[in-house]
């Protein structure tokens, strides 16, 4: 498994702008925030969602611009961020490596210095966390992690929002993760430590957790080799594809290694009665999950998919409101 190095940027940065200092709250990884801050984002996400469902106008982003930078392709990330920012009154610009100087020779630092002078918020979906943090370190505006190789914090906030809607607070609950030790699992581990729930991880031999990417301590998670054992006592069972972007050359090997790490009816039966099933999508039915589970009564994947829109509104509002002149 590819190993990564922990970076210590943190989510708070100060940038000098003329004679003023701007205190910037980036959203780079969950470990940068307190329990109260994450709960504030989740609460506001639920409140803003309720306003939309009621047809009540709420457009606090009028006159503001979000720049989205995609070095990794996406469906849900683009649609949810773009729709969400538009719905809150703002405007959106989409950039890709192919359609900007990032794909040629301009450094990530210089791109940040230029782009952040022309917008109010940046979302980046990229490869290494180091690229994201290099951009944030040179940005005048808040930067949101849309996904990196190491972390996927917006998705975990989405999943927790979805859990809260169906089951109430996640504090004191148990989550079961089945599959690879990937960016999703690392953000789940951060969330468990901060928000006070336990996570059981069913991960095959040869795919160890990179301990440099998770909070200290081992009281908030347990690693299993058997998905059924990991699912016992779980209130939520969740998974992801066996082969993440960037590991396509390992696809056949991973199919063999993960063959026994499928969420099926036996795994769900081992979990608590009424346990939820989630998947960040896209899903490969017959591989990491059976059609019976993902299309079954315990699955909330479509509510989960919609909640990317709402969770990210809470995150964007928090970052913009918390980033003020000091």
Can you say where each PLM-predicted feature lies in the sequence?
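Anion-binding alpha/beta catalytic cores of soluble intermediary-metabolism enzymes, centered on
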Residues: 113-115, 120-191, 279
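Rossmann-like adenosine-cofactor binding region
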Residues: 215-292
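Adenosine-phosphate binding glycine-rich loop
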Residues: 274-275, 281-326
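Active-site cofactor/substrate anionic-group-binding motifs, chiefly glycine-
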Residues: 65-66, 70-118
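Glycine-rich phosphate/diphosphate-binding loop of Rossmann-like nucleotide-binding domains
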Residues: 71-83, 167-239
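Positively charged, low-complexity intrinsically disordered leader regions
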Residues: 18-79, 83, 151
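Short Gly/Ser/Thr- and charged-rich N-terminal loops/segments
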Residues: 6-11
């Amino acid at each position: 498994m590819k190993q990564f190095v922990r970076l210590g940027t943190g989510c708070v940065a100060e940038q000098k702008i003329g004679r003023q200092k701007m205190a910037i709250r980036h959203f780079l990884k969950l470990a940068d925030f307190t329990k109260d801050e994450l709960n504030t984002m989740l609460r506001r996400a639920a409140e803003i969602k309720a306003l939309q469902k009621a047809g009540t106008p709420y457009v606090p982003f009028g006159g503001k611009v979000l720049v989205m930078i995609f070095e990794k392709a996406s469906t849900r990330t683009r649609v949810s961020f773009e729709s969400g920012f538009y719905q809150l009154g703002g405007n959106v610009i989409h950039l890709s490596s192919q359609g900007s100087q990032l794909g040629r020779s301009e450094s990530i630092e210089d791109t940040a210095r230029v782009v952040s002078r022309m917008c109010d918020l940046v979302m980046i979906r990229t490869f290494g966390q180091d690229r994201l943090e290099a951009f944030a370190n040179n940005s005048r505006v808040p930067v949101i992690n849309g996904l990196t190789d190491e972390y996927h914090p917006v998705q975990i906030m989405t999943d927790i929002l979805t859990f809260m809607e169906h089951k109430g607070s996640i504090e004191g609950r148990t989550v079961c993760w089945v599959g690879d030790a990937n960016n999703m699992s690392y953000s789940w581990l951060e969330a468990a430590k901060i928000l006070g729930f336990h996570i059981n991880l069913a991960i095959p031999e040869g795919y160890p957790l990179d301990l440099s990417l998770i909070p200290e301590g081992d009281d908030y998670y347990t690693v299993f080799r058997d998905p059924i054992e990991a699912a016992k006592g779980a209130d939520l069972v969740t998974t992801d594809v066996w082969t993440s972007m960037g590991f396509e050359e390992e696809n056949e090997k991973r199919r063999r290694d993960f063959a026994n790490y499928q969420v099926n009816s036996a795994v769900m039966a081992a979990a608590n009665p009424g346990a939820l099933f989630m998947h960040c999508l896209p899903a490969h039915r017959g591989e990491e999950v059976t059609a019976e589970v993902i299309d079954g009564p315990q699955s909330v994947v479509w509510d989960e998919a919609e909640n990317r829109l709402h969770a990210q509104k809470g995150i964007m509002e928090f970052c913009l409101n918390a980033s003020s002149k000091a």
